[in-house]
């Protein structure tokens, strides 16, 4: 026996489901990453928060010792996008913070006063640390890659690499 309820047919069900979806979406808070403005002196402490591997939730915090205030998620708040997956390290050189995000295969260059991205270097295997030799040359070590990358920080590009032939996958990374 088939039970047929009046008004419970496709003509009613489809619009009802659509209406419920619209009502629920209207109640949800969507965060599209609105950008905030910062005007710090750059004189403070940056804290790279590694985040969980493969969750893309790394973040950058800034502690101002004068105000004794910590600002969390400053990269996200200044740029409207997440830092990425596993913030490994950060180096400051000439007013630019270089944030190495290893599982996202990127190094972000940020203004240390505004936290805004001013450039990025991409196409690494899994970068870990950056070491500057000059304004136009830096080395980037990696994990699970037997090369040390040579980059030009002014042009935000990889210019070459140094082979480390005795490095094996068991030894892990080129900084060892």
PLM region spans:
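Predominantly soluble domains enriched in secretory-pathway, periplasmic, or organellar proteins
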Residues: 26-176
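Sec-dependent bacterial lipoprotein signal peptides
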Residues: 1-26
